[in-house]
Amino acid sequence: MILDTSFLIDLFDGQRHAFEKGQQLSDEGAVQRVPSPVVTELSYGAAFGDEDERRAVRNALRMYPVVEQTDRIAQRAGRLLARADMDADGRSGIDKVDPMVAAVADRYDEPVLTANVADFEALGVAVETY
């Protein structure tokens, strides 16, 4: 399972459905991966918080394997975004991080766990929500 930023933020914020989904994945023994661009987004957000928030993010991220952006994944991300933009006449509105997350999902043939369903569906990858 590829964990998107939206899921991890909801999990950190104590959102019940996110917690229950995380518990389900743990109970099932599912591998939960965090793409490195998600780490970037979380670190950016935490930088605006206090030391407790920064520590909480660092500690939480230690629980998951981080998938680095390789050349292959980066190229796939570009193709996924280009296809989504072409399908939407150049106006998909998808940011640059979501295709990088989607490319990791494509590489591992795993769904993205997110609250941001529409963008990931437009990128053509499997999606789960909570």
Region locations from a protein language model:
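Active-site regions of enzymes building and remodeling cell-envelope glycoconjugates
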Residues: Y64-P65, G124-Y130
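Alpha-helix capping/helix-boundary segments
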Residues: F7-L8, V38, I73, V101, ...
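Acidic, metal-associated active-site segment
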Residues: L42, D95-P111
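Acidic catalytic patch
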Residues: P65-D85
